[in-house]
Amino acid sequence: MSANQGASGTASDVAGNTASASVTGIDIDQTPPTVTYAGNAGSYTVDENVDITCSAADNLSGVASNTCSDVHAPAYVFPLGTNTLSASATDVAGNTGSASASFTVIVTGASLCNLSTRFSATPQLAHALCVKVEDIDSAPTPGARAGRIGAFIHEVDAQTGKNLSAEEAAILIALANAL
């Protein structure tokens, strides 16, 4: 901000009258607004919720517009790996500020078990799926691991439309394949 600036001017009318004026103490906003993300845990397993808020502030001329958007969603709706949120804000003086926040979504055996339990219509299915996930985590070889992932997927396929919706089944299968 440029503080305590001044301006002066003179005006004349058609009759030849003139007047002058000076003004001091003018503050010129040259500071961009701030964009802030809060609540970011940085890393989320697929069974957790992502709750990140975005805010824009400008203490000088005020915020004219911003692209902030809060995120309140289950982690499994985001792609696995790094996800980045970005927002910008423009103040009344035309200055622009921006920020971004990144977070990572991962799948683990425990998080896939928890999500399977959440999606399952029966406790028996939840238990069966969790046992299969535990078997994946304890597989002694890559071949055994692939076979156990296949057994989990087969069980999910068998329960699709019965004790799991097609959408839930697709999510569980994609996550199992990512283990």
Residue ranges and their predicted role:
Residues 1-28, 40-47, 59-96, 101, ...:
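Serine/threonine-rich, repeat-prone extracellular segments and beta-strand-based repeat modules
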Residues 30, 58, 105-107:
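Non-catalytic surface loops within mature trypsin-like serine protease
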Residues 32-34:
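Proline-centered linker/hinge motifs at extracellular inter-domain junctions
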Residues 47-48, 82-85, 95, 100-179:
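Soluble extracellular-acting proteins and domains
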Residues 52-56:
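Aromatic/hydrophobic beta-strand junction motif of beta-rich domains
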